A protein has these predicted regions:
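Glycine-rich flexible loops
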Residues: 1-224
């Protein structure tokens, strides 16, 4: 909240996370005397007498946010990782795809534009730094996988799966008796030093979409 006010001004309200619904709508309505409102894990809400006025507010506040990030961005801390050779990448992706496809065939795509992020010393913090929105969590999971060239993938992926099971079951216990829910515990995205970001999905379209979503959330975590 402090950062929001510092970046956008005190006339922009901040609302802690609420699930979408009537209560959240009521809270936003109570902020009508403010210039705009930022909803935690949802985004920016603006208004005006015309759609153009509301749109211009959005552009204005986005520029303020970008300027704040630019002025407060930490220096990128890259490692000495070099881009892997084609044969090294192919072998790694074959191991990765094989492990992810044990229950259902997966397609894997690579986003080389995230190579600088994957090569940073704090890559673990970037991968586990949280998602930008709840939709991102639903699409690509809570955390990204981090995997190295020499990894056989099996142990790394199994440890991530077990951790996600524990995380999921902790909240499943709070649901009504008899409630059942199945969830895909496979990592959907990950950062690979020397390669970039991988995205996995049952189709090439889904795999590419996952890397695009991951780019937003990884860049956000890197700028914190």
């Amino acid at each position: 909240e402090e950062v929001i006010h510092e970046a956008l001004g005190n006339d922009v309200a901040f609302v802690p996370y609420y699930r979408p619904g009537f209560m959240l709508s009521k809270i936003v309505q109570q902020c009508s005397d403010k210039y705009a409102v930022v909803l935690e894990h949802h985004g920016l809400v603006t208004w005006g007498n015309t759609h153009e006025e509301s749109y211009l507010k959005t552009i204005e506040l986005e520029k303020k946010a970008q300027e704040y990030i630019k002025n407060h961005k930490t220096k990128k801390d890259t490692t000495s990782h070099h881009k892997l050779q084609t044969d090294q990448i192919e072998k790694l992706l074959l191991r990765l795809r094989g492990q992810l496809s044990l229950n259902q065939k997966q397609i894997i795509t690579i986003d080389e534009n995230q190579l600088n992020l994957a090569n940073r010393n704090d890559v673990i913090q970037i991968a586990t730094g949280g998602r930008s929105t709840l939709e991102h969590i639903l699409r690509i999971g809570k955390d990204s996988l981090v995997i190295s060239e020499g990894d056989d993938c099996k142990e790394t992926i199994q440890s991530v799966q077990e951790a996600y099971k524990k995380y999921f079951n902790k909240y499943l216990e709070k649901l009504p008796a008899g409630f059942d829910m199945h969830v895909n515990i496979n990592p959907k995205v990950g950062l690979i030093p020397g390669v970039g970001c991988f995205g996995a999905g049952i189709s090439l379209k889904e795999a590419k979409r996952n890397t695009e979503i991951a780019k937003h959330t990884h860049e956000g975590a890197a700028n914190v």
